[in-house]
Amino acid sequence: GLVGSEMCIRDSIETIAERLRFYKAENIVVDPVMVATSGSDLIASDAVRTLCWELFPLSALITPNRHEAEVLAEMAIHSRDDMVRAAQTIAGRYGCNVLLKGGHSDTDADDLLALRDGQLLWFPGQRVDNPNTHGTGCTLSSAIAANLAKGFGLADSIARAKAYLTDALNAQLDLGQGSGPLDHTLGGTGVENWMHGVPDAVQDK
């Protein structure tokens, strides 16, 4: 998630990384939060370098959106082939597993997992017509981390988290003005009902 202000962000990242190493923390999921949906930079370039080289190698997974992946891979992403090249570039460069989120596509919401060993997995998704999408990336990464902590494997954790996020969007919570938050209670139905379709959520390349 987003860490601190521009003045202290590099020190904050270094401190977080040091503590993670000290405690030998596991199941670390890093949502880079480098570039806003609008395309605006959220942190300075020197902080990006610190994030990449200090936190990414410690993580079980990083979850960049398309804009962030373009910065990390130093290339434009316009197609599924571009997603593959970008995800593989990031995974190879920083030695981490990469879930490149496809939610910014105009046609679908397919996500791509590129593993350190070169394996690729697609997670198909459908776009949900809901203007209230504030916090989608944070919700996905947090749900993945929670599933990893519960003992699920990486692919299963992503599939479960993606199913949960889709249902949270479909709950159509509408609060206040602008891009509002998701309904993490799934319309009051409870999370026990959000596993439908998960066994079919993972596809090999």
Regions found by a protein language model. Name each.
Residues 2-9:
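Short, small-residue-biased leader/transition segments that mark boundaries at the very start
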Residues 12-25, 110-111:
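Short Gly/Thr/Asp-enriched flexible loops that form oxyanion-binding sites at enzyme active sites
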Residues 23-28, 94-96:
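A short helix->loop->beta-strand "cap" motif at the edges of active sites that frequently abuts
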Residues 70-71, 130-154:
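Short, small-residue alpha-helix embedded
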Residues 76-83, 149-159:
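Short, charged, surface-exposed loops that flank catalytic or proteolytic processing sites
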